[in-house]
Protein backbone atom coordinates (compact mmCIF):
# COMPACT_ATOMS: atom_id res chain seq x y z
CA UNK A 1 0.00 0.00 0.00
CA UNK A 2 2.82 2.42 0.91
CA UNK A 3 4.73 1.69 -2.33
CA UNK A 4 1.58 2.23 -4.39
CA UNK A 5 0.90 5.52 -2.59
CA UNK A 6 4.48 6.67 -3.16
CA UNK A 7 4.31 5.82 -6.88
CA UNK A 8 0.98 7.57 -7.39
CA UNK A 9 2.25 10.58 -5.43
CA UNK A 10 5.31 10.78 -7.68
CA UNK A 11 3.17 10.68 -10.83
CA UNK A 12 0.66 13.21 -9.47
CA UNK A 13 3.49 15.53 -8.44
CA UNK A 14 5.38 15.58 -11.74
CA UNK A 15 2.53 15.67 -14.26
CA UNK A 16 1.08 19.18 -13.53
CA UNK A 17 4.35 20.86 -14.54
CA UNK A 18 4.61 18.66 -17.61
CA UNK A 19 1.02 19.51 -18.60
CA UNK A 20 1.74 23.24 -18.25
CA UNK A 21 4.83 22.91 -20.46
CA UNK A 22 2.91 20.90 -23.08
CA UNK A 23 0.29 23.67 -23.07
CA UNK A 24 3.03 26.15 -23.96
CA UNK A 25 4.15 23.89 -26.81
CA UNK A 26 0.58 23.73 -28.13
CA UNK A 27 0.21 27.53 -28.22
CA UNK A 28 3.65 28.08 -29.73
CA UNK A 29 2.97 25.30 -32.27
CA UNK A 30 -0.31 26.93 -33.29
CA UNK A 31 1.34 30.34 -33.67
CA UNK A 32 4.27 28.88 -35.60
CA UNK A 33 2.01 26.87 -37.95
CA UNK A 34 -0.22 29.87 -38.67
CA UNK A 35 2.81 32.03 -39.48
CA UNK A 36 4.09 29.43 -41.98
CA UNK A 37 0.78 29.43 -43.93
CA UNK A 38 1.27 30.90 -47.44
CA UNK A 39 -1.11 33.76 -48.29
CA UNK A 40 -2.55 32.03 -51.38
CA UNK A 41 -3.01 28.55 -49.81
CA UNK A 42 -5.63 27.22 -47.45
CA UNK A 43 -3.54 24.26 -46.31
CA UNK A 44 -1.93 24.55 -42.88
CA UNK A 45 0.37 21.93 -41.29
CA UNK A 46 -1.32 21.20 -37.95
CA UNK A 47 0.32 17.84 -37.25
CA UNK A 48 2.71 19.23 -34.64
CA UNK A 49 0.06 21.11 -32.55
CA UNK A 50 -2.27 18.10 -32.73
CA UNK A 51 0.53 15.83 -31.52
CA UNK A 52 1.01 18.09 -28.50
CA UNK A 53 -2.76 18.09 -27.88
CA UNK A 54 -2.75 14.27 -27.89
CA UNK A 55 0.27 14.27 -25.57
CA UNK A 56 -1.48 16.63 -23.15
CA UNK A 57 -4.64 14.48 -23.22
CA UNK A 58 -2.57 11.43 -22.26
CA UNK A 59 -0.85 13.38 -19.46
CA UNK A 60 -4.20 14.66 -18.13
CA UNK A 61 -5.63 11.13 -18.20
CA UNK A 62 -2.61 9.82 -16.29
CA UNK A 63 -2.96 12.65 -13.76
CA UNK A 64 -6.66 11.87 -13.27
CA UNK A 65 -5.86 8.16 -12.85
CA UNK A 66 -3.15 8.87 -10.28
CA UNK A 67 -5.43 11.22 -8.32
CA UNK A 68 -8.27 8.68 -8.34
CA UNK A 69 -5.81 5.98 -7.27
CA UNK A 70 -4.69 8.17 -4.37
CA UNK A 71 -8.31 8.59 -3.25
CA UNK A 72 -8.89 4.81 -3.36
CA UNK A 73 -5.67 4.07 -1.45
CA UNK A 74 -6.48 6.71 1.15
CA UNK A 75 -9.96 5.24 1.68
CA UNK A 76 -8.50 1.77 2.26
CA UNK A 77 -5.74 3.14 4.45
CA UNK A 78 -8.30 5.05 6.54
CA UNK A 79 -9.99 1.79 7.57
CA UNK A 80 -6.71 -0.03 8.25
CA UNK A 81 -5.17 2.81 10.26
CA UNK A 82 -8.32 3.45 12.32
CA UNK A 83 -8.51 -0.25 13.17
CA UNK A 84 -4.83 -0.41 14.07
CA UNK A 85 -4.91 2.65 16.31
CA UNK A 86 -8.10 1.52 18.06
CA UNK A 87 -6.50 -1.88 18.70
CA UNK A 88 -3.43 -0.14 20.15
CA UNK A 89 -5.66 1.85 22.52
CA UNK A 90 -7.63 -1.23 23.59
CA UNK A 91 -4.48 -3.33 24.05
CA UNK A 92 -2.99 -0.59 26.20
CA UNK A 93 -6.20 -0.36 28.26
CA UNK A 94 -5.95 -4.09 29.01
CA UNK A 95 -2.50 -3.60 30.57
CA UNK A 96 -3.54 -0.82 32.95
CA UNK A 97 -4.36 -1.23 36.62
CA UNK A 98 -7.86 -0.70 37.95
CA UNK A 99 -6.64 2.48 39.68
CA UNK A 100 -6.19 4.10 36.26
CA UNK A 101 -9.89 3.66 35.52
CA UNK A 102 -10.82 5.32 38.80
CA UNK A 103 -8.89 8.49 37.96
CA UNK A 104 -10.69 11.34 36.18
CA UNK A 105 -7.44 12.67 34.66
CA UNK A 106 -6.84 9.28 33.08
CA UNK A 107 -10.33 9.41 31.53
CA UNK A 108 -9.47 12.82 30.06
CA UNK A 109 -6.40 11.26 28.45
CA UNK A 110 -8.42 8.33 27.17
CA UNK A 111 -11.16 10.59 25.77
CA UNK A 112 -8.67 12.84 23.98
CA UNK A 113 -6.78 9.85 22.58
CA UNK A 114 -9.89 8.05 21.30
CA UNK A 115 -11.67 11.11 19.90
CA UNK A 116 -8.99 11.90 17.31
CA UNK A 117 -7.47 8.43 17.00
CA UNK A 118 -9.50 7.41 13.96
CA UNK A 119 -8.69 10.48 11.84
CA UNK A 120 -5.36 12.02 12.86
CA UNK A 121 -2.99 9.16 11.90
CA UNK A 122 -4.52 8.96 8.41
CA UNK A 123 -4.51 12.74 8.14
CA UNK A 124 -0.81 12.78 8.99
CA UNK A 125 -0.04 10.10 6.41
CA UNK A 126 -2.12 11.81 3.72
CA UNK A 127 -0.54 15.18 4.41
CA UNK A 128 2.94 13.67 4.33
CA UNK A 129 2.31 12.17 0.90
CA UNK A 130 0.49 15.35 -0.15
CA UNK A 131 3.51 17.40 0.89
CA UNK A 132 5.73 15.14 -1.20
CA UNK A 133 3.40 15.53 -4.19
CA UNK A 134 3.32 19.32 -3.80
CA UNK A 135 7.09 19.46 -3.38
CA UNK A 136 7.60 17.59 -6.66
CA UNK A 137 5.14 19.86 -8.44
CA UNK A 138 6.86 22.95 -7.00
CA UNK A 139 10.23 21.74 -8.24
CA UNK A 140 8.87 21.44 -11.78
CA UNK A 141 7.13 24.82 -11.50
CA UNK A 142 10.31 26.39 -10.12
CA UNK A 143 12.37 25.04 -13.01
CA UNK A 144 9.91 26.62 -15.46
CA UNK A 145 9.51 29.94 -13.59
CA UNK A 146 13.21 30.50 -13.02
CA UNK A 147 13.60 30.88 -16.78
CA UNK A 148 11.37 33.95 -16.47
CA UNK A 149 13.05 35.38 -13.35
CA UNK A 150 14.30 34.24 -9.96
CA UNK A 151 12.08 36.95 -8.48
CA UNK A 152 8.98 35.15 -9.72
CA UNK A 153 9.92 32.22 -7.49
CA UNK A 154 10.63 34.54 -4.54
CA UNK A 155 7.25 36.28 -4.91
CA UNK A 156 5.53 32.90 -5.14
CA UNK A 157 7.06 31.82 -1.82
CA UNK A 158 6.66 35.06 0.13
CA UNK A 159 3.03 35.53 -0.87
CA UNK A 160 1.95 32.31 0.85
CA UNK A 161 3.88 32.73 4.13
CA UNK A 162 1.51 35.08 6.05
CA UNK A 163 -1.47 32.72 5.72
CA UNK A 164 0.74 29.78 6.77
CA UNK A 165 1.93 31.55 9.93
CA UNK A 166 -1.61 32.49 10.91
CA UNK A 167 -2.94 28.98 10.25
CA UNK A 168 -0.21 27.41 12.38
CA UNK A 169 -0.99 29.79 15.23
CA UNK A 170 -4.70 28.99 15.09
CA UNK A 171 -3.95 25.24 14.92
CA UNK A 172 -2.09 25.49 18.24
CA UNK A 173 -4.94 27.48 19.77
CA UNK A 174 -7.52 24.93 18.56
CA UNK A 175 -5.52 22.11 20.14
CA UNK A 176 -5.29 23.91 23.48
CA UNK A 177 -9.06 24.44 23.49
CA UNK A 178 -9.57 20.77 22.62
CA UNK A 179 -7.31 19.62 25.47
CA UNK A 180 -8.73 21.93 28.12
CA UNK A 181 -12.32 20.90 27.61
CA UNK A 182 -11.90 17.11 27.82
CA UNK A 183 -13.99 16.98 31.05
CA UNK A 184 -16.87 18.86 29.38
CA UNK A 185 -16.68 16.56 26.36
CA UNK A 186 -16.85 13.51 28.63
CA UNK A 187 -19.79 15.08 30.47
CA UNK A 188 -21.63 15.51 27.17
CA UNK A 189 -20.94 11.90 26.15
CA UNK A 190 -22.09 10.69 29.56
CA UNK A 191 -25.44 12.47 29.20
CA UNK A 192 -25.81 10.98 25.69
CA UNK A 193 -25.25 7.56 27.25
CA UNK A 194 -27.86 8.17 29.94
CA UNK A 195 -30.48 9.18 27.39
CA UNK A 196 -29.73 6.42 24.88
CA UNK A 197 -29.20 3.31 27.04
CA UNK A 198 -31.99 0.90 27.98
CA UNK A 199 -30.53 0.22 31.44
CA UNK A 200 -31.07 3.90 32.35
CA UNK A 201 -34.36 4.42 30.50
CA UNK A 202 -36.70 3.16 33.24
CA UNK A 203 -35.45 5.46 35.98
CA UNK A 204 -35.13 8.46 33.67
CA UNK A 205 -38.78 8.07 32.64
CA UNK A 206 -40.11 7.41 36.15
CA UNK A 207 -38.25 10.35 37.67
CA UNK A 208 -38.99 12.51 34.61
CA UNK A 209 -35.31 13.34 34.19
CA UNK A 210 -35.42 13.70 30.40
CA UNK A 211 -35.89 17.48 30.17
CA UNK A 212 -33.34 18.14 32.92
CA UNK A 213 -30.72 15.98 31.20
CA UNK A 214 -31.47 17.52 27.80
CA UNK A 215 -31.08 20.94 29.40
CA UNK A 216 -27.66 20.00 30.72
CA UNK A 217 -26.73 18.55 27.34
CA UNK A 218 -27.71 21.79 25.59
CA UNK A 219 -25.83 23.82 28.20
CA UNK A 220 -22.60 21.89 27.65
CA UNK A 221 -23.08 22.02 23.88
CA UNK A 222 -23.64 25.80 23.97
CA UNK A 223 -20.42 26.27 25.89
CA UNK A 224 -18.41 24.06 23.53
CA UNK A 225 -20.03 25.54 20.42
CA UNK A 226 -19.33 29.07 21.61
CA UNK A 227 -15.62 28.31 21.92
CA UNK A 228 -15.58 26.62 18.49
CA UNK A 229 -17.56 29.42 16.84
CA UNK A 230 -15.29 32.21 18.08
CA UNK A 231 -12.16 30.35 17.03
CA UNK A 232 -13.61 29.38 13.63
CA UNK A 233 -14.72 32.96 12.85
CA UNK A 234 -11.33 34.44 13.77
CA UNK A 235 -9.54 31.70 11.84
CA UNK A 236 -11.68 32.29 8.74
CA UNK A 237 -11.40 36.09 8.91
CA UNK A 238 -7.61 36.11 9.18
CA UNK A 239 -7.36 33.41 6.52
CA UNK A 240 -9.36 35.57 4.10
CA UNK A 241 -7.44 38.79 4.81
CA UNK A 242 -4.07 37.12 4.39
CA UNK A 243 -5.20 35.32 1.23
CA UNK A 244 -5.58 38.78 -0.33
CA UNK A 245 -1.79 39.05 -0.14
CA UNK A 246 -1.49 35.98 -2.35
CA UNK A 247 -4.13 37.32 -4.74
CA UNK A 248 -2.32 40.66 -5.04
CA UNK A 249 0.97 38.87 -5.69
CA UNK A 250 -0.62 36.84 -8.48
CA UNK A 251 -2.04 39.84 -10.30
CA UNK A 252 1.22 41.75 -9.99
CA UNK A 253 2.96 38.77 -11.58
CA UNK A 254 0.12 38.57 -14.13
CA UNK A 255 0.70 42.18 -15.18
CA UNK A 256 4.45 41.62 -15.34
CA UNK A 257 4.07 38.58 -17.64
CA UNK A 258 1.61 40.45 -19.91
CA UNK A 259 4.06 43.36 -20.26
CA UNK A 260 6.93 40.96 -21.05
CA UNK A 261 4.78 39.35 -23.75
CA UNK A 262 3.72 42.66 -25.30
CA UNK A 263 7.30 43.94 -25.56
CA UNK A 264 8.36 40.66 -27.18
CA UNK A 265 10.55 39.27 -24.38
CA UNK A 266 8.53 36.05 -24.20
CA UNK A 267 6.29 34.20 -26.63
CA UNK A 268 2.52 33.80 -26.41
CA UNK A 269 3.07 30.17 -25.42
CA UNK A 270 5.49 31.26 -22.69
CA UNK A 271 2.89 33.70 -21.38
CA UNK A 272 0.24 30.97 -21.25
CA UNK A 273 2.63 28.63 -19.47
CA UNK A 274 3.88 31.19 -16.95
CA UNK A 275 0.36 32.33 -16.05
CA UNK A 276 -0.72 28.71 -15.56
CA UNK A 277 2.43 27.79 -13.65
CA UNK A 278 2.30 30.86 -11.42
CA UNK A 279 -1.35 30.35 -10.51
CA UNK A 280 -0.95 26.62 -9.97
CA UNK A 281 2.39 27.13 -8.23
CA UNK A 282 0.82 29.65 -5.90
CA UNK A 283 -1.97 27.19 -5.07
CA UNK A 284 0.46 24.27 -4.76
CA UNK A 285 2.81 26.19 -2.46
CA UNK A 286 -0.12 27.25 -0.30
CA UNK A 287 -1.23 23.61 -0.17
CA UNK A 288 2.29 22.55 0.79
CA UNK A 289 2.35 25.06 3.65
CA UNK A 290 -1.15 23.96 4.65
CA UNK A 291 0.12 20.37 4.73
CA UNK A 292 3.02 21.42 6.97
CA UNK A 293 0.64 23.32 9.25
CA UNK A 294 -1.76 20.38 9.21
CA UNK A 295 1.05 17.97 10.09
CA UNK A 296 1.94 20.22 13.00
CA UNK A 297 -1.71 20.22 14.10
CA UNK A 298 -2.00 16.43 13.65
CA UNK A 299 1.10 15.91 15.78
CA UNK A 300 -0.37 18.10 18.50
CA UNK A 301 -3.48 15.93 18.62
CA UNK A 302 -1.51 12.70 18.29
CA UNK A 303 0.51 13.74 21.35
CA UNK A 304 -2.63 12.80 23.31
CA UNK A 305 -2.46 9.32 21.80
CA UNK A 306 1.27 9.07 22.50
CA UNK A 307 0.72 10.18 26.12
CA UNK A 308 -1.92 7.52 26.57
CA UNK A 309 0.15 4.75 24.97
CA UNK A 310 3.13 5.76 27.14
CA UNK A 311 1.08 5.69 30.35
CA UNK A 312 3.31 3.85 32.83
CA UNK A 313 2.22 0.31 33.62
CA UNK A 314 3.12 -1.37 36.87
CA UNK A 315 4.73 -4.75 36.28
CA UNK A 316 5.01 -6.27 39.75
CA UNK A 317 4.20 -9.75 38.53
CA UNK A 318 6.57 -12.61 39.13
CA UNK A 319 6.70 -16.00 37.48
CA UNK A 320 5.70 -18.32 40.30
CA UNK A 321 2.87 -20.70 39.40
CA UNK A 322 2.89 -22.91 42.51
CA UNK A 323 3.26 -22.06 46.19
CA UNK A 324 5.84 -23.46 48.59
CA UNK A 325 3.25 -24.41 51.22
CA UNK A 326 -0.08 -25.42 49.62
CA UNK A 327 -1.66 -26.12 53.02
CA UNK A 328 -1.07 -22.59 54.32
CA UNK A 329 -3.96 -21.00 52.42
CA UNK A 330 -4.24 -17.20 52.39
CA UNK A 331 -2.64 -14.75 54.80
CA UNK A 332 -3.10 -11.00 55.10
CA UNK A 333 -0.21 -9.51 57.11
CA UNK A 334 -0.79 -5.91 58.29
CA UNK A 335 -2.30 -4.95 54.94
CA UNK A 336 -3.21 -1.29 54.38
CA UNK A 337 -4.43 0.43 51.24
CA UNK A 338 -5.09 4.05 50.29
CA UNK A 339 -6.75 4.98 47.01
CA UNK A 340 -4.74 7.29 44.73
CA UNK A 341 -5.63 10.91 45.41
CA UNK A 342 -7.07 10.10 48.83
CA UNK A 343 -5.47 10.85 52.19
CA UNK A 344 -7.75 8.51 54.13
CA UNK A 345 -6.79 4.79 54.12
CA UNK A 346 -9.54 2.49 52.87
CA UNK A 347 -8.02 -0.41 54.83
CA UNK A 348 -5.70 -0.28 57.85
CA UNK A 349 -3.53 -3.08 59.24
CA UNK A 350 -5.71 -6.01 58.21
CA UNK A 351 -4.37 -9.39 59.32
CA UNK A 352 -6.16 -12.71 58.81
CA UNK A 353 -5.48 -16.34 57.95
CA UNK A 354 -7.78 -18.60 55.94
CA UNK A 355 -6.83 -22.25 55.54
CA UNK A 356 -7.88 -24.50 52.63
CA UNK A 357 -11.56 -25.41 52.90
CA UNK A 358 -12.45 -22.59 55.31
CA UNK A 359 -15.23 -20.07 54.66
CA UNK A 360 -14.82 -16.46 55.76
CA UNK A 361 -17.72 -14.00 55.90
CA UNK A 362 -16.89 -10.30 55.90
CA UNK A 363 -19.40 -8.01 57.61
CA UNK A 364 -19.53 -4.25 57.78
CA UNK A 365 -21.54 -1.21 56.87
CA UNK A 366 -21.40 0.23 53.35
CA UNK A 367 -18.08 1.94 52.68
CA UNK A 368 -16.25 0.09 55.43
CA UNK A 369 -13.71 -1.45 53.02
CA UNK A 370 -15.12 -4.93 52.37
CA UNK A 371 -14.97 -4.82 48.57
CA UNK A 372 -11.56 -3.13 48.68
CA UNK A 373 -10.21 -6.10 50.63
CA UNK A 374 -11.53 -8.44 47.94
CA UNK A 375 -9.93 -6.37 45.17
CA UNK A 376 -6.60 -6.60 46.98
CA UNK A 377 -6.98 -10.38 47.21
CA UNK A 378 -7.73 -10.64 43.49
CA UNK A 379 -4.78 -8.33 42.66
CA UNK A 380 -6.88 -5.61 41.14
CA UNK A 381 -5.05 -3.35 43.61
CA UNK A 382 -1.63 -3.56 45.23
CA UNK A 383 -1.41 -3.01 49.01
CA UNK A 384 0.05 0.32 50.08
CA UNK A 385 1.79 -1.54 52.90
CA UNK A 386 1.86 -5.07 54.26
CA UNK A 387 1.55 -8.17 52.13
CA UNK A 388 -0.84 -10.93 51.08
CA UNK A 389 0.43 -14.51 50.79
CA UNK A 390 -1.05 -17.49 48.96
CA UNK A 391 0.45 -20.90 49.77
CA UNK A 392 3.33 -19.13 51.49
CA UNK A 393 4.21 -16.85 48.53
CA UNK A 394 3.58 -13.09 48.27
CA UNK A 395 0.95 -12.31 45.63
CA UNK A 396 3.45 -9.92 44.03
CA UNK A 397 5.61 -12.91 43.09
CA UNK A 398 2.81 -14.93 41.48
CA UNK A 399 2.33 -15.14 37.74
CA UNK A 400 -0.86 -13.16 37.11
CA UNK A 401 -2.50 -15.77 34.88
CA UNK A 402 -1.70 -18.63 37.26
CA UNK A 403 -3.03 -16.62 40.21
CA UNK A 404 -6.30 -15.62 38.59
CA UNK A 405 -6.98 -19.13 37.32
CA UNK A 406 -7.22 -20.11 40.98
CA UNK A 407 -9.88 -17.51 41.78
CA UNK A 408 -13.58 -17.59 40.92
CA UNK A 409 -15.23 -14.27 41.71
CA UNK A 410 -18.63 -12.62 41.61
CA UNK A 411 -18.75 -8.91 42.33
CA UNK A 412 -21.88 -7.13 43.43
CA UNK A 413 -21.89 -5.16 40.16
CA UNK A 414 -21.15 -8.15 37.93
CA UNK A 415 -21.34 -7.54 34.18
CA UNK A 416 -24.51 -8.51 32.31
CA UNK A 417 -23.01 -9.28 28.91
CA UNK A 418 -25.21 -8.87 25.85
CA UNK A 419 -24.12 -12.39 24.78
CA UNK A 420 -25.87 -15.76 24.74
CA UNK A 421 -26.63 -17.55 28.02
CA UNK A 422 -23.80 -20.01 27.41
CA UNK A 423 -21.28 -17.26 26.69
CA UNK A 424 -22.41 -15.33 29.78
CA UNK A 425 -21.49 -18.39 31.82
CA UNK A 426 -18.45 -19.29 29.71
CA UNK A 427 -16.68 -15.96 30.29
CA UNK A 428 -15.89 -17.30 33.76
CA UNK A 429 -13.17 -19.37 32.06
CA UNK A 430 -12.24 -17.79 28.75
CA UNK A 431 -10.13 -20.82 27.78
CA UNK A 432 -13.35 -22.87 27.75
CA UNK A 433 -15.67 -20.12 26.55
CA UNK A 434 -17.40 -22.34 23.95
CA UNK A 435 -17.46 -25.59 25.95
CA UNK A 436 -21.19 -26.37 26.22
CA UNK A 437 -20.65 -29.32 28.55
CA UNK A 438 -18.84 -27.02 30.99
CA UNK A 439 -21.71 -24.54 30.72
CA UNK A 440 -24.18 -27.18 31.86
CA UNK A 441 -22.06 -28.31 34.81
CA UNK A 442 -21.53 -24.70 35.92
CA UNK A 443 -25.24 -23.89 35.50
CA UNK A 444 -26.22 -26.85 37.68
CA UNK A 445 -23.79 -25.76 40.39
CA UNK A 446 -25.08 -22.19 40.17
CA UNK A 447 -28.72 -23.41 40.32
CA UNK A 448 -29.42 -21.75 36.95
CA UNK A 449 -30.11 -24.90 34.92
CA UNK A 450 -33.83 -24.99 35.66
CA UNK A 451 -34.75 -21.55 34.31
CA UNK A 452 -32.24 -21.82 31.42
CA UNK A 453 -34.10 -24.88 30.13
CA UNK A 454 -37.28 -22.79 29.94
CA UNK A 455 -35.66 -20.16 27.70
CA UNK A 456 -36.49 -20.28 23.94
CA UNK A 457 -33.07 -21.56 22.87
CA UNK A 458 -31.68 -22.70 26.19
CA UNK A 459 -27.96 -21.90 26.36
CA UNK A 460 -28.05 -20.30 22.90
CA UNK A 461 -30.63 -17.69 23.93
CA UNK A 462 -29.43 -14.14 23.33
CA UNK A 463 -29.59 -12.08 26.54
CA UNK A 464 -30.28 -8.36 26.81
CA UNK A 465 -32.20 -6.01 24.53
CA UNK A 466 -29.38 -4.63 22.42
CA UNK A 467 -29.56 -7.29 19.72
CA UNK A 468 -32.42 -8.93 17.81
CA UNK A 469 -34.29 -11.67 19.68
CA UNK A 470 -32.69 -10.84 23.02
CA UNK A 471 -34.36 -11.98 26.26
CA UNK A 472 -34.14 -10.05 29.52
CA UNK A 473 -33.75 -11.90 32.83
CA UNK A 474 -34.87 -10.98 36.32
CA UNK A 475 -32.30 -9.77 38.83
CA UNK A 476 -32.33 -13.12 40.62
CA UNK A 477 -31.84 -15.04 37.37
CA UNK A 478 -28.90 -12.83 36.43
CA UNK A 479 -27.31 -13.53 39.81
CA UNK A 480 -27.65 -17.27 39.22
CA UNK A 481 -25.93 -16.76 35.86
CA UNK A 482 -23.14 -14.94 37.71
CA UNK A 483 -22.88 -17.79 40.24
CA UNK A 484 -22.62 -20.28 37.39
CA UNK A 485 -19.92 -18.07 35.85
CA UNK A 486 -17.82 -18.42 39.01
CA UNK A 487 -18.20 -22.22 38.88
CA UNK A 488 -16.82 -22.30 35.30
CA UNK A 489 -13.37 -22.22 36.87
CA UNK A 490 -13.37 -25.82 38.00
CA UNK A 491 -9.72 -25.56 39.02
CA UNK A 492 -10.33 -22.52 41.25
CA UNK A 493 -9.72 -23.21 44.94
CA UNK A 494 -10.62 -19.67 46.03
CA UNK A 495 -14.16 -18.36 45.59
CA UNK A 496 -15.03 -14.73 46.18
CA UNK A 497 -18.69 -13.79 46.52
CA UNK A 498 -19.49 -10.09 46.95
CA UNK A 499 -23.23 -9.81 47.69
CA UNK A 500 -23.94 -12.67 45.26
CA UNK A 501 -27.62 -13.06 46.18
CA UNK A 502 -28.76 -9.50 46.88
CA UNK A 503 -31.55 -9.84 44.27
CA UNK A 504 -32.73 -13.25 45.52
CA UNK A 505 -35.36 -13.81 48.20
CA UNK A 506 -34.31 -15.12 51.62
CA UNK A 507 -35.64 -18.67 51.08
CA UNK A 508 -33.87 -19.04 47.72
CA UNK A 509 -30.69 -17.58 49.22
CA UNK A 510 -30.75 -20.11 52.07
CA UNK A 511 -31.14 -22.96 49.57
CA UNK A 512 -28.36 -21.60 47.37
CA UNK A 513 -25.88 -21.35 50.23
CA UNK A 514 -26.67 -24.79 51.58
CA UNK A 515 -26.10 -26.07 48.05
CA UNK A 516 -23.03 -23.86 47.69
CA UNK A 517 -21.45 -25.03 50.94
CA UNK A 518 -21.78 -28.66 49.89
CA UNK A 519 -20.05 -27.91 46.57
CA UNK A 520 -17.13 -25.97 48.08
CA UNK A 521 -15.99 -28.20 50.93
CA UNK A 522 -12.36 -28.10 49.75
CA UNK A 523 -12.31 -24.49 48.60
CA UNK A 524 -11.55 -21.27 50.45
CA UNK A 525 -14.48 -18.87 50.29
CA UNK A 526 -14.62 -15.12 50.93
CA UNK A 527 -18.24 -14.04 51.35
CA UNK A 528 -19.61 -10.52 51.66
CA UNK A 529 -23.28 -10.37 52.59
CA UNK A 530 -25.63 -8.21 54.63
CA UNK A 531 -27.90 -11.19 55.38
CA UNK A 532 -26.90 -12.78 58.65
CA UNK A 533 -28.83 -15.95 57.86
CA UNK A 534 -26.09 -16.51 55.27
CA UNK A 535 -23.19 -15.02 57.20
CA UNK A 536 -23.69 -17.31 60.20
CA UNK A 537 -22.98 -20.34 57.99
CA UNK A 538 -19.31 -19.28 57.58
CA UNK A 539 -16.48 -20.88 59.59
CA UNK A 540 -15.11 -17.44 60.44
CA UNK A 541 -16.65 -14.00 60.48
CA UNK A 542 -14.68 -10.77 60.26
CA UNK A 543 -16.22 -7.38 61.08
CA UNK A 544 -14.73 -4.30 59.38
CA UNK A 545 -15.43 -0.75 60.49
CA UNK A 546 -13.86 2.31 58.83
CA UNK A 547 -11.27 0.12 57.15
CA UNK A 548 -10.16 -1.67 60.32
CA UNK A 549 -10.91 -5.18 61.51
CA UNK A 550 -12.70 -4.71 64.84
CA UNK A 551 -13.93 -8.27 65.45
CA UNK A 552 -13.21 -11.81 64.29
CA UNK A 553 -14.63 -15.19 65.31
CA UNK A 554 -17.53 -17.57 64.78
CA UNK A 555 -21.16 -16.50 64.84
CA UNK A 556 -21.57 -17.83 68.38
CA UNK A 557 -18.38 -16.20 69.63
CA UNK A 558 -19.26 -12.81 68.19
CA UNK A 559 -22.78 -12.85 69.62
CA UNK A 560 -21.30 -13.68 73.01
CA UNK A 561 -18.84 -10.79 72.69
CA UNK A 562 -21.82 -8.44 72.32
CA UNK A 563 -19.94 -6.07 69.99
CA UNK A 564 -20.66 -4.56 66.58
CA UNK A 565 -21.56 -7.91 65.04
CA UNK A 566 -24.11 -8.64 67.75
CA UNK A 567 -25.59 -5.16 67.39
CA UNK A 568 -26.00 -5.52 63.60
CA UNK A 569 -27.35 -9.06 63.96
CA UNK A 570 -30.05 -8.12 66.47
CA UNK A 571 -30.98 -5.02 64.43
CA UNK A 572 -31.65 -7.23 61.42
CA UNK A 573 -33.39 -9.89 63.50
CA UNK A 574 -35.74 -7.26 64.94
CA UNK A 575 -36.95 -6.51 61.43
CA UNK A 576 -38.29 -10.07 61.10
CA UNK A 577 -40.21 -10.00 64.40
Regions found by a protein language model. Give the residues of each.
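Transmembrane helix-loop-helix hairpins at lipid-water interfaces of multipass membrane proteins
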Residues: 3-66, 142-174, 248-255, 259-268, ...
